[in-house]
Regions:
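Amphipathic alpha-helical interface surfaces
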Residues: 45, 72, 155-159
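Short, contiguous, pocket-lining structural segments
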Residues: 5, 9, 37, 41, ...
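Surface-exposed, charge/polar-rich loops and edge strands
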Residues: 2-33, 51-54, 79-82, 93-245
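Short hydrophobic beta-strand segments
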Residues: 57-64, 136
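A short, structured active-site edge motif that brings together acidic residues
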Residues: 87-92
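Extended, H/D-rich, highly charged conserved domains that either
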Residues: 61-77, 81-83
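A short, well-structured juxtamembrane/interface segment
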Residues: 38-56, 68-71
Length: 245
């Protein structure tokens, strides 16, 4: 499938899910299109996630900064877990915020908010992160094979690839997404080699374990546009020179 056709197919799935969420009044967003849905069952999904052994055993997690995953970040900090959260658009040389539950200047419910975290949390480079026990992603759509779609910017995939190359995640690192049940689709989700699939889907009323989800082995430079690399310092600083000739 050509890139343009692939993008169109992905966008068609996103639009279907956004429309379904809007019709069901299942989100807090005034307009959910173009966003990771802030679904109304986010707290229930976080509570269900917190019952899983993979959560209970995790000491260090990376979680997206989206509103839908705020209850996950709050729980993690309240339970003494270290939380890494990406700087918006990975736009700084040190692209992750470090939320250390032992040194928070405000309660976890405040510290976990992305804007508050940005006001106090130190930023760290990829190589300075501790190995991750668990990764929590937001999604627009996900199917039972673990294939997922974000809002289309690709930042979660880039983060994962950078962490994979740094040895901070492995094939066995669990990746979870929390979603509304309406975001779980039986539609085939078109994917590419750089797309990160999830191991576990957690909705307010169900948990789905996915088999053999796809993982990129690292940064697929040929899939990145020059302007993407330039805009993300962590990529630009790690780009390997092209072979001479």
């Amino acid at each position: 499938m050509a890139d343009s056709s692939l993008d169109q197919a992905k966008q068609a799935v996103r639009t279907q899910i956004w429309d379904a969420l809007t019709a069901a009044d299942a989100v807090h967003d005034a307009s959910v299109h173009g966003r990771i849905p802030h679904f109304k069952g986010a707290e229930e999904a976080a509570a269900r996630l917190a019952e899983l052994p993979v959560w209970k055993n995790a000491e260090v997690i990376k979680c997206v900064p989206d509103k839908a995953q705020l209850p996950v970040r709050i729980r993690a900090l309240e339970e003494g877990k270290t939380v890494y959260m990406a700087v918006p658009k990975l736009a700084t040389a040190k692209p992750f915020y470090l939320l250390d539950p032992a040194t928070l200047p405000v309660p976890p419910a405040e510290a976990a908010q992305s804007r508050v975290a940005a006001s106090f949390a130190p930023t760290v480079d990829v190589d300075a992160l501790s190995p991750l026990d668990l990764i929590i992603l937001g999604s627009v759509a996900v199917n039972r094979t673990g294939a997922r779609l974000g809002k289309g910017a690709g930042y979660s995939d880039i983060e994962f690839a950078l962490l994979m190359e740094a040895g901070l995640v492995t094939e066995s690192t669990t990746v979870v997404t929390t979603v509304d049940a309406l975001q779980i689709t039986d539609i085939r989700i078109p994917t590419t080699d750089h797309d990160v699939a999830v191991d576990v889907i957690v909705a307010p009323n169900k948990t789905i374990v996915c088999r053999a989800p796809h993982r990129p082995s690292g940064v697929l430079w040929s899939d990145l546009a020059a302007e993407q690399i330039t805009a993300i310092p962590a990529l630009a600083s790690r780009r390997r020179p092209s072979p001479a000739g």
